[in-house]
């Protein structure tokens, strides 16, 4: 298993994972599946030189999950805040992969002053 920075060619697999959650769970609030074009635009926000980063986990060329940090809210009071997300393919659940993705993501974004705070609702 490899964890690496997300690449443009990962967008189709990421879209498939997102769409599973849209279509089969209440984890996302979208009612219509994402398009490849929509996710390509979404992908453009990530860079390994900013606090907005994307990591993917692959095994034997198959993308099993991803974790990312994104803008939290588009208001200046939250400029120093990021929202972090992890999604896994169904066959990758329960194997510690989400924790490994989060560990890599948190390690990388700390260099940009991001700290981890947990909010429970």
Report residues per predicted region:
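A short beta-loop-alpha structural element at the N-terminal edge
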Residues: 2-14
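Conserved GNAT-fold acetyl-CoA-binding loop/helix
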Residues: 15, 19-43
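Glycine-rich phosphate-binding loop
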Residues: 92, 96
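Conserved small/polar residues in nucleotide/adenosyl-binding loops
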Residues: 117-121
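Acetyl-CoA-dependent GNAT
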Residues: 8, 33-91, 102-103, 107-108, ...
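Short, solvent-exposed beta-strand edge segments and adjacent coil->beta transition regions
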Residues: 1, 26, 81-83, 114-116
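Conserved beta-strand positions that form and line the central face of beta-propeller blades
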Residues: 2-5, 28, 56
């Amino acid at each position: 298993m490899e964890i690496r920075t997300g690449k443009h060619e990962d967008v189709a697999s990421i879209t498939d994972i997102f769409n599973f959650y849209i279509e089969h769970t209440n984890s996302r609030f979208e009612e219509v599946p994402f398009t490849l074009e929509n996710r390509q635009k979404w992908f453009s926000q990530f860079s390994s030189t900013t606090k907005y980063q994307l990591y993917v986990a692959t095994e034997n060329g198959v993308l099993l999950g991803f974790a990312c940090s994104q803008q939290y809210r588009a208001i200046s009071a939250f400029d120093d805040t990021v929202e972090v997300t992890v999604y896994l393919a169904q066959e990758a659940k329960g194997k510690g992969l989400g924790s490994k993705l989060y560990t890599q993501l948190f390690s990388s974004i700390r260099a940009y002053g991001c700290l981890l705070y947990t909010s429970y609702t």
